[in-house]
Design a protein with these regions (language model features):
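Catalytic active-site module of serine/aspartate enzymes centered on a nucleophile-bearing elbow/loop
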Residues: 227-258
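Conserved alpha/beta-hydrolase catalytic His-Asp/Glu region
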Residues: 121-127, 138-196
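Flexible "cap/lid" loop of the alpha/beta hydrolase fold
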Residues: 98-146
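Active-site loop/oxyanion-hole signature of alpha/beta-hydrolase fold enzymes
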Residues: 12, 32-39, 45-88, 249
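Short beta-strand/loop motif that positions the catalytic acidic residue
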Residues: 197, 203-205, 209
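Alpha/beta-hydrolase fold catalytic core
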Residues: 1-19, 39-43, 78-83, 171, ...
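Gly/Ala-rich beta-loop-alpha elbow adjacent to hydrolase catalytic centers
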Residues: 89, 93, 97
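Active-site glycine-rich loops that stabilize anionic/oxyanionic intermediates
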Residues: 15, 23-26, 91
Length: 258
């Protein structure tokens, strides 16, 4: 898909579309366990947000926003011929889901929030985003992996998961990671949207998520009418990578209930 840039995706399976939106500073490869495990029940499409993975950017110094990412998701759905989709988003991808719901509600069949939150950043968190943007711009991605890598996993991550996380983080261009950080800093607070979401919702959260404690996620899910909440054991902030079997089972059960 070309419009001064290209948006990449990877797909497997057939049938109604189940789309996946990755977190920061990752790419579509984080969903490999879902592409392989859920292709029998849906046409699974893992997207690269602009600048990530195989997707390009249209400026040397990009400026991102959750709304811009949401519009890109809608464009990708157009490109694959999907009027509607079940859409999953992890962490930053969950922030994109909230924007997608506000901007393109007609494209959403159901929402699957994973290891994310509805609240906007606190002043302290916003300052942290700015430090992250400055750090990657000056030092590259290795220091970010060194600080963030151990925090996104649970207590017993496999070497394979750690290696995949490291590869994705180091493959992300510093200017893209910086733009991500500032976009997350500036995202809207979505707590007021929770009781107004009218499509089916599944909220998955790693029991060992140290970045976004599970109790806050459970409380947010409880504000969405009819939402189902599932805790993923042995999962941290990237639960779909750490425990793909439990994640896939929860998603399969949810989709069967629609």
């Amino acid at each position: 898909m070309t419009e001064a840039m290209e948006l990449a995706y990877e797909e497997r399976g057939s049938g109604p579309v189940l789309a996946f939106i990755h977190g920061f500073p990752l790419d579509r490869r984080m969903w490999i366990g879902q592409l392989s495990g859920l292709a029998k029940v849906r046409r699974c499409v893992a997207m690269d947000l602009r600048g990530h993975g195989l997707s390009s950017i249209d400026a040397k110094d990009p400026e991102f926003s959750m709304d811009l990412f949401a519009d890109d998701v809608a464009k990708t759905l157009d490109a694959i011929g999907a009027d509607k989709a079940d859409i999953a988003g992890l962490s930053m991808g969950g922030y994109v889901l909230f924007s997608l719901w506000r901007r393109h509600p007609d494209r959403v069949r159901s929402l699957i929030f994973i290891d994310t939150k509805a609240e906007a950043d606190s002043d302290e968190a916003k300052a942290g985003r700015e430090k992250t943007a400055e750090a990657v711009s000056e030092q590259g991605m290795q220091p970010i992996y060194d600080s963030l890598g151990p925090k996104v996993v649970g207590s017993s991550p496999s070497i394979e998961v750690q290696d995949k996380l490291k590869q994705m983080m180091l493959d992300t261009a510093p200017e893209v990671a910086a733009a991500d950080a500032l976009a997350m800093r500036d995202r809207a607070d979505s707590t007021a949207d929770l009781p107004n979401i009218t499509v089916p919702v599944l909220w998955l959260h790693g029991e060992e998520d140290a970045l976004m404690p599970i109790d806050g996620a459970r409380a947010s899910a409880a504000k969405i009418p009819g939402a189902k909440f599932v805790a993923i054991p042995k999962g941290g902030h990237v639960a779909p990578m750490e425990n793909p079997d439990a994640t896939n089972a929860a998603i399969t059960d949810f989709l069967k209930s629609l």
